[in-house]
Amino acid sequence: MNIATKLMASLVASVVLTACSGGGSSGSSSKPNSELTPKVDMSAPKAEQPKKEEVPQADNSKAEEPKEMAPQVDSPKAEEPKNMAPQMGNPKLNDPQVMAPKMDNPQKDAPKGEELSKDKSNAEILKELGVKDINSGIINNADVVLNLKIDEKDHITVVLDKGKINRNHLKVTNTISAQDIKTLKDSSGKLLGYYGYMQLNQVRQDENYSDEKVSLNEYYLLSMNDADKIRPTKSISYKGDMFYSYKDVGNQKLKASVEASYDDVTKKVSMKVFGENNDYWKLGEFGRTNLLENQVTGAKVGEDGTIINGTLYSKIDNFPLKLTPDANFSGGIFGKNGEVLAGSAISEKWQGVIGATATTKEDKK
């Protein structure tokens, strides 16, 4: 405390001396100034010592603050990469998930899949077509199981799964007495379908009653793949056959020649059928009245290749220039380029199936 009092007294004295020397010469005033300056300088460090002692205390608090901040800064930095890692990982994981369906899509392309499904053997196609009658569809007689068989030359035959069946006291014998099946193929050789007829005999013997039943059934067969039906984009001529029979004749198979043509301008198909015993038919649109032959001009072909409202008109006895509605005709045009015509005719008196193909190589292209 004495030192501080002395310092304060010396400071006051220096101030008084400076004030008293204010009116003197400039030279006298410079001396006390020069003398007082070191005194002030000497006192300054002494006075600053306690301040320096407080400084480290302030420094200690400041030093502690960054130590506290360091973990605070480190923690968000450590958390940020942790947060970013899954964020960066998610898009990487999502990318293959998005790409996966893109890679799968071409594999599941409908057109390609359909093309591959169409690349079947004729035997596989024939199995899908089945044995179909124009009246009843799939033949489903009791104790009869029928299959189709195709050989190396694409000849088709109907075969029985079991010719003989023994069940308790009942004995069944099935036989195919006659058949004639023709294949219908496009220009590439792919099987489109078949048409023909078959005669099936069945004998049923019941031992309990000593009873025997014999039945003879005739079937006109036609089975085509509707997916191959098409309307041609140009005019085409066809030739083929019709298998037919009259219901009152009794299992007599007849055969007729067929001439047909499709007109790309009118979108109509015309057809003439020349049968046995001077039989003759001409294709026209549905009607119930007699028409002159030149009025029977064919039937329309729909966009999908279906022959619409077809009717076969036949000759009228004693009226050579007129035709009368005789049978309903249903069918269509098939194949890669519409090179196959097929259909069936059903009447109260007769029935038949028709198959015809393009006459020239140009028509098949």
From Swiss-Prot:
Lipid attachment site numbers (N-palmitoyl cysteine): C20
Sequence segments annotated as region (Disordered): 19-121
Subcellular location: Cell outer membrane
Matching InterPro entries: OMP/PagP_b-brl (IPR011250)
Sequence ranges of Basic and acidic residues compositional bias: 48-68, 105-121
Membrane topology of this protein: Lipid-anchor
Keyword Lipoprotein: yes
The protein's name in its UniProt record: Outer membrane lipoprotein A
Species whose genome carries this gene: Actinobacillus pleuropneumoniae
Gene name tied to this protein: omlA
